[in-house]
Design a protein with these regions (language model features):
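Active-site cofactor/cluster-binding pocket
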Residues: 1-188
């Protein structure tokens, strides 16, 4: 079983990202779950969401405490949360940032990828200049960095879960797939 933990802030789309990813994995023949964990349920508050998948039926229903991979939708989360808590060695950390992966020496035990999802979201009219919605963008980068899911399945998941601006969300995901910067081992 593979488990992914998303760290974001309310309004960025972490919960929908986990659902889109689960849908994409299901489309590729895997069993998948997606679920959130909320603290203070307000816009801008830290949020975690989770996706787990396997080739066989999943009976586990707990939160993800030892993720295989971590996705950080808001770089400022790194200042308030230990995103590597429980992260398995050699796991991927994907960070929404304009910085290169080498800017994160504290993550030397892990494989690191970065993408400027805020910029790509803004360029595609997703959210606002001060509150870009980066969930679909980050999933394009996740597909490329990890190799765990294909971009076509992500795009189909976007069609299913995103109520508006489907073309803009798909375009942003495709661009993120092309622009993600990967450091460490090649995709699994």
């Amino acid at each position: 079983m593979i488990e992914i933990r998303f760290h974001g802030r309310g309004g960025q789309g972490a919960v929908i990202a986990s659902k889109i990813l689960a849908s994409a994995l299901f489309r590729e023949g895997k069993h998948a779950q997606a679920f959130p964990a909320f603290g203070g349920e307000r816009r801008g508050a830290p949020v975690m969401a989770f996706t787990r998948f396997d080739k066989k039926t999943i009976t586990r229903r707990s939160m993800v405490y030892e993720p295989d991979h971590v996705v950080v939708l808001d770089e400022s989360i790194l200042e308030v949360a230990d995103v590597t808590s429980g992260l398995k060695e050699k796991g991927w950390i994907l960070v929404n940032t304009p910085k290169p992966p080498s800017a994160y020496p504290q993550f030397h035990k892990f494989r690191v990828a970065t993408v400027d999802a805020n910029r790509l979201a803004q360029e595609n009219g997703l959210g606002t200049a001060t509150a870009p919605v980066v969930n679909t963008v980050i999933l394009g980068a996740f597909a490329k960095a990890t190799g765990l899911v294909g971009l076509p399945a992500i795009l189909e998941g976007i069609e299913e879960y995103v109520p508006g601006k489907k073309e803009a969300n798909s375009a942003a995901a495709k661009t993120a797939f092309e622009q993600v910067i990967i450091f460490g081992s090649s995709p699994i």
